[in-house]
């Protein structure tokens, strides 16, 4: 029995299957953790969702900002952009079923036995584990409820960007969503910066990557995240693992086998990298909430 953690798939099904074949993944025995952004930009978002859903309890995933954007597009709140390449999913006969499954997936995973925490963007330095779990449960509750379109309509925006226990309602949900699915840089006090998308070495002062600030999360826990392809998994402190290595931009799909901390990679198939590059995508370009 092995625990495998994989970075952002972004509709790259062939690379996912090739990567899982490298480690002889067995859904009857193994557990697969996915950092979110299953969909968009790659060629096979529909088939990725079908495959991941078919794995049932073998999968522990979190939602990413592109997954949330898909939900908003399907609900008629946001516009379907051709570069996201999700039209086959939107038009699929099982789209309702897949969307209803997707919106019931978590935005945070915590395993107290393995001492693992996973969120698409990471954990804001303003939260301890208990606060992160509380805020994640609030987002998950509204996403799985009948009022989820109201939340999806309100999630777009960069404010508030500073955590306070006094936050309530949609403002609180928006902060939590941004912290869990969009965050990269923070100010020294932990306040989110939602503007800079650069690499850490090119970020203006006083911004720092969220993982370089003192954090409230128990240091016995490791944090797994995706979202930030331009990091290429490098430059993170001990106990922090960035697994998005930009497969849909022509990079790799990366897998970490937790038991021995061994990495496996599958290079993007050239045709898909060329399609995205020719469309003028910037590595790590994200949906704007």
UniProtKB/Swiss-Prot annotation:
Known catalytic reactions: P(1),P(4)-bis(5'-adenosyl) tetraphosphate + H2O = 2 ADP + 2 H(+)
Keyword annotations of the record: Hydrolase
Gene3D superfamilies, alphabetized: 3.60.21.10
Database matches in InterPro entries: ApaH (IPR004617), Calcineurin-like_PHP_ApaH (IPR004843), Metallo-depent_PP-like (IPR029052)
EC number: 3.6.1.41
Domain of life: Bacteria
SUPFAM superfamilies: Metallo-dependent phosphatases
Pfam families tied to this protein: Metallophos
GO molecular function, one term: bis(5'-nucleosyl)-tetraphosphatase (symmetrical) activity
Function in brief: Hydrolyzes diadenosine 5',5'''-P1,P4-tetraphosphate to yield ADP.
HAMAP family per UniProt: ApaH
PANTHER family recorded: CYTOCHROME C5, PTHR40942
Family of the protein in this entry: Belongs to the Ap4A hydrolase family.
Full protein name: Bis(5'-nucleosyl)-tetraphosphatase, symmetrical
Organism annotation: Yersinia pseudotuberculosis serotype O:3 (strain YPIII)
Gene that encodes it: apaH
């Amino acid at each position: 029995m092995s625990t495998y953690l994989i970075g952002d798939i972004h509709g790259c099904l062939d690379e996912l299957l090739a990567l899982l074949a490298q480690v002889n993944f067995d859904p009857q025995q193994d557990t697969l953790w996915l950092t979110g952004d299953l969909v968009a930009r790659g060629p096979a978002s529909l088939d990725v969702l079908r495959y991941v859903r078919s794995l049932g309890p073998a999968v522990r995933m979190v939602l990413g900002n592109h997954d949330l954007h898909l939900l908003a597009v399907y609900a008629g709140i946001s516009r379907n952009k051709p570069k996201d390449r999700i039209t086959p999913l939107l038009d699929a006969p099982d789209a309702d079923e897949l969307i209803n499954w997707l919106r019931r997936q978590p935005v945070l995973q915590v395993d107290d036995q393995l001492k693992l925490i996973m969120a698409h963007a990471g954990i804001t330095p303003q939260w301890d584990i208990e606060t992160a779990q509380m805020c994640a449960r609030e987002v998950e509750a509204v996403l799985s409820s009948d009022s989820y379109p109201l939340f999806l309509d309100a999630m777009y925006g960069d404010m508030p960007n500073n955590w306070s226990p006094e936050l309530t309602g949609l403002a609180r949900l928006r902060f939590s969503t941004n912290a869990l699915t969009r965050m990269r840089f923070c100010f020294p006090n932990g306040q989110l910066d939602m503007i800079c998308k650069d690499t850490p070495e090119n970020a203006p002062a006083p911004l720092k990557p969220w993982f370089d600030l003192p954090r409230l999360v128990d240091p016995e826990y490791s944090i797994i995240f995706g979202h930030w392809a331009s990091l290429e998994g490098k430059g993170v402190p001990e106990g922090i693992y960035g697994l998005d290595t930009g497969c849909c931009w022509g990079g790799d799909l990366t897998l970490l086998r937790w038991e021995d901390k061994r990495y496996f990679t599958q290079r993007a198939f050239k045709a898909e990298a060329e399609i995205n590059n020719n469309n003028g995508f910037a590595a790590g370009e994200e949906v704007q909430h």
